[in-house]
Amino acid sequence: MNPNQKIITIGSICMTIGIISLILQIGNIISIWVSHSIQTGSQNHTGICNQRIITYENSTWVNQTYVNINNTNVVAGKDTTSVTLAGNSSLCPIRGWAIYSKDNSIRIGSKGDVFVIREPFISCSHLECRTFFLTQGALLNDKHSNGTVKDRSPYRALMSCPIGEAPSPYNSRFESVAWSASACHDGMGWLTIGISGPDDGAVAVLKYNGIITETIKSWRKRILRTQESECVCVNGSCFTIMTDGPSNGPASYRIFKIEKGKITKSIELDAPNSHYEECSCYPDTGTVMCVCRDNWHGSNRPWVSFNQNLDYQIGYICSGVFGDNPRPKDGKGSCDPVTVDGADGVKGFSYRYGNGVWIGRTKSNSSRKGFEMIWDPNGWTDTDSNFLVKQDVVAMTDWSGYSGSFVQHPELTGLDCMRPCFWVELIRGRPREKTTIWTSGSSISFCGVNSDTANWSWPDGAELPFTIDK
């Protein structure tokens, strides 16, 4: 075969291959078009994109959500329209508390990537509830978890994750650099308050939908601090309480009214014989009720209620069923501070129903162990220790910690009332469990229902020490 024939032969072969490839590509395009037509049915077909497929590969789980997008509409499973959370409803009538969530974060963290945290709390928008928490910039079972018993450090941050999930780097959202914090949703956006900085010059940074909108400088230079639970939004305005001053004597307490992250009004409480820290607040028929911690001299809890103009009233829960820790045995209460075992304290909450009160408290009088809910039908105004209902939540033998209130608005639940809920922190590690090098916690939450509930114990349940502790 001469050179010209070779060239012609090679060219013919290349052309034949090219034609075959073109035919295959055309066939592939036709196949995809037919498949798409069958899948969508018609151009106007819509469907909810909610199919979730889980595959497993080499012991690593992959969560794949397949979304079919056609030429016209994608229908979401939930209406994301902004609303204004009115906060005008009264609290729902309840008979007890139903378990709502448990994240088991310490148990999961023995083997998985879970943040070292404390001060978790829950807050809900009209679409979802989220767990907020203060990380220590470290993971469980890692060397940086050493020494995390410390409250205030530059590594702490407010983050959030979906309620009931263990807080990890893979499901958590950064909110603010903070060692004291609060957050709430007004129906249009999240307000976050994060306090960080030195003890004598800390600054609260306010963010609205993630953007810095305002700052508040420590006015007493004595550890500016806030609620460690949700703030309260009513008719587009959000309210929070901050404390600055001694933890064992009279301090300064201010209420702030905030709209879209900007402070519109603030007042200082005239309460020389009261002590307000780490307030747990909730809306009730358009007003705000806060039940707080007296770390100075009260074993019963102080309260402050105020309207949207910040006109306020103050007092102490009168019941002889005392709510703080440490505390004396139940007995004769007072509408002023009960000073027996009144020093120190723990964050907690109560819900007022007329003259009655649901009191959440540790089961132990002297340590942060166990948790129970008690209904005292006259406890807001009367000083006896009689109660009608006691519901066990955490056994006396298991660790608890901080607790606080949160509510679910009618815009979320579809009810015509405000559903009361609460969370309990389950602290593990130091200072009580000295076999560890770290301090962290998991959390449980409950919501009020007007139906049957269970008495049981929902403890943290992690077996300590971890590998890093040995």
Curated annotation (Swiss-Prot):
Compartment(s): Virion membrane; Host apical cell membrane
Region (Hypervariable stalk region) location: 36-90
Virion surface side: 28-470
Residue intervals passing through the bilayer: 7-27
Record-listed E.C. numbers: 3.2.1.18
Superkingdom, natural source: Viruses
Cofactor: Ca(2+)
Region span, Head of neuraminidase: 91-470
Membrane disposition: Single-pass type II membrane protein
Intravirion side of membrane: 1-6
UniProt GO MF annotations: exo-alpha-sialidase activity; metal ion binding
Catalytic activity reported: Hydrolysis of alpha-(2->3)-, alpha-(2->6)-, alpha-(2->8)- glycosidic linkages of terminal sialic acid residues in oligosaccharides, glycoproteins, glycolipids, colominic acid and synthetic substrates
Enzyme kind, highest EC tier: hydrolase
Upper lineage: Viruses, Riboviria, Orthornavirae, Negarnaviricota, Polyploviricotina
Annotated glycosylation sites: N44, N58, N63, N70, N88, N146, N235, N365, N455
Subunit structure: Homotetramer.
Purpose of the protein: Catalyzes the removal of terminal sialic acid residues from viral and cellular glycoconjugates. Cleaves off the terminal sialic acids on the glycosylated HA during virus budding to facilitate virus release. Additionally helps virus spread through the circulation by further removing sialic acids from the cell surface. These cleavages prevent self-aggregation and ensure the efficient spread of the progeny virus from cell to cell. Otherwise, infection would be limited to one round of replication.
Name of the featured protein: Neuraminidase
Activity regulation behaviour: Inhibited by the neuraminidase inhibitors zanamivir (Relenza) and oseltamivir (Tamiflu). These drugs interfere with the release of progeny virus from infected cells and are effective against all influenza strains. Resistance to neuraminidase inhibitors is quite rare.
